[in-house]
Every structure is written in structure tokens, then in C-alpha cells.
Amino acid sequence: MITKLLLLAIFGIAMAHLEGVVVVYLRKALGMLDSESNKDSIEKFPVLYLKIEMSREAATIIMLFVIAWLVGGSWIEKGVFFLWTFAFWDLFYYLSLYILIKWPPRFTTIDVLFLIPKPWIAPVWFPISVSVLTILIITILALIGIF
């Protein structure tokens, strides 16, 4: 179990960095590298790019779902592995963006978390906190042998 969790964490981290790089290129192409808040940026996005971005988000969720499905045995394991990998992906996505372009500048910076089905907007501390909490809970459950 620990080996699977470790490998899924590595997968989530690598995927987060790849996605962070894509977002940096997208922001550069659209002239939005210096934007303080993604909430402001979304209003400047051409509709075509919003649809492309939504397809990227859907592909991300599909990849996380598929890896959890392939690695997990029971339905509970599949769900736990999805949440685990998602948490690492989300946490390290923000870390990757910060390393690459120093964004977000603060934990209180407002971000567009997802566009599907409608824009989810919140300060970045919220998804970071949820991810850290998810990782801690799953780690504790794994260490005490719950799954």
C-alpha cells in the first residue's frame, strides 16, 4: 500500500508540474503573466480559450480517475487513490506555479479553481488546505491499517 501511495504521489507531482508549465505558457501567450488574480484573467479569456481550458481540466480529471482505477482494487481503494493523487496534483500545481512565475503571491490570492461545470472561485489557501488535510488523513489511515 505504501509503495502505491508513494508512486501515486510522484505521479500527481509530475502531472502538477506539467500542468503548471502549460498554464505558464498559456498565460504568456495571452499576455497575462503579471496578473494578480485569475478571477480577473478569466474575464479577458476569449471564449475559444475558455473551452480549450475546460477540455484540459476534463482531461486532468480523467487522467487522475484512470490511474486510480488501474491501481486500486476495491471501490474504496480506487476512491482513496483518486483523492490522494488529486491532493498531490493540486498542492504541487500551486507550488510549481510559484516556483516558475512566483504566482500566487499570497495564500489569499483569488483563483479560478475549476471552470467545470461553472467557475469555482476561491482564495488559494482553500484548495491548498483541503489537499494537505486529505494527504494527512489518508496517511494516518494507511499507517493504522484502515485500508
Task: Specify the residue positions occupied by each region the protein language model found.
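Hydrophobic core of alpha-helical transmembrane segments in multi-pass integral membrane proteins
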Residues: 61-68, 127-143
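Sequence termini and other peripheral, non-core segments
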Residues: 5-10, 136-147
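Cytoplasmic juxtamembrane interface segments
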Residues: 53-76
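Aromatic-anchored segments of alpha-helical transmembrane domains
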Residues: 16-17, 85-94
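Active-site His/Glu-centered metal-binding helix of metallohydrolases
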Residues: 21, 59, 91, 95
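Alpha-helical transmembrane segments of multi-pass membrane proteins
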Residues: 13-28
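Interfacial segments of alpha-helical transmembrane regions
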Residues: 2-12, 73-88
